[in-house]
């Protein structure tokens, strides 16, 4: 019988299987992902408030008419839980909903990981780079669950962090910068 932790880990790892990345992964990589997800779920150190900040469509990839029609102020909110590991890296589980490019609600949930650096000794300033693995749903895709694996970067001070990702794409599709504030408490 599956526990809810196994189900949670399977849902978060679903995008890896659907994109074929799981088949290229070295042995143990998915176990590490699963263990990190379960540990973050069972042993959170913090709870997080997510506030979407900006959606920016790459100007080289869209006509001005399209850009003018898109929403680039994705108001919404989210909640999550997170922890810092023994290396100082960040792990988080999150659910967020925001207004997408078409001003329709887009929920997203998943797991994020960032290697984190503190370049100024004794300072609360930090920056990071990593990835997020999750599932989103969009109005223009009839709210069918869509797996995502995206790069992530951040810069922060103390409990406030600006996290961001870039959704790659083609002309008139994708090529979107998305950023949100994460307040850790």
Curated annotation (Swiss-Prot):
GO terms for molecular function: acyltransferase activity. The record marks 66 as: Role in lipopolysaccharide recognition. It is found in: Cell outer membrane. It comes from the Bacteria. Transmembrane segments: none annotated. Homodimer. NCBIfam families: PRK11045.1 (NF008271). Belongs to the lipid A palmitoyltransferase family. This is Lipid A acyltransferase PagP. It comes from Edwardsiella piscicida.
């Amino acid at each position: 019988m599956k526990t809810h932790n196994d189900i949670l880990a399977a849902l978060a790892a679903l995008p890896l299987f659907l994109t074929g990345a799981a088949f290229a992964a070295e042995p143990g990589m998915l176990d590490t992902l699963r263990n990190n997800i379960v540990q973050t779920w069972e042993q959170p150190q913090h709870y997080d408030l997510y506030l979407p900040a900006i959606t920016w469509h790459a100007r080289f990839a869209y006509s001005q008419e399209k850009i003018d029609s898109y929403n680039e102020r994705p108001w919404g909110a989210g909640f999550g839980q997170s922890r810092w590991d023994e290396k100082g890296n960040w792990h988080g589980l999150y659910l967020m909903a925001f207004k997408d490019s078409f001003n329709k609600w887009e929920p997203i949930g998943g797991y994020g990981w960032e290697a984190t650096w503190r370049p100024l000794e004794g300072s609360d300033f930090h920056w990071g780079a990593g990835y997020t693995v999750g599932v989103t749903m969009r109005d223009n895709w009839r709210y069918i669950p869509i797996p995502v694996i995206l790069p992530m970067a951040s810069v922060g001070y103390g409990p406030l962090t600006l996290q961001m990702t870039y959704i790659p794409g083609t002309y008139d599709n994708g090529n979107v910068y998305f950023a949100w504030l994460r307040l850790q408490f």
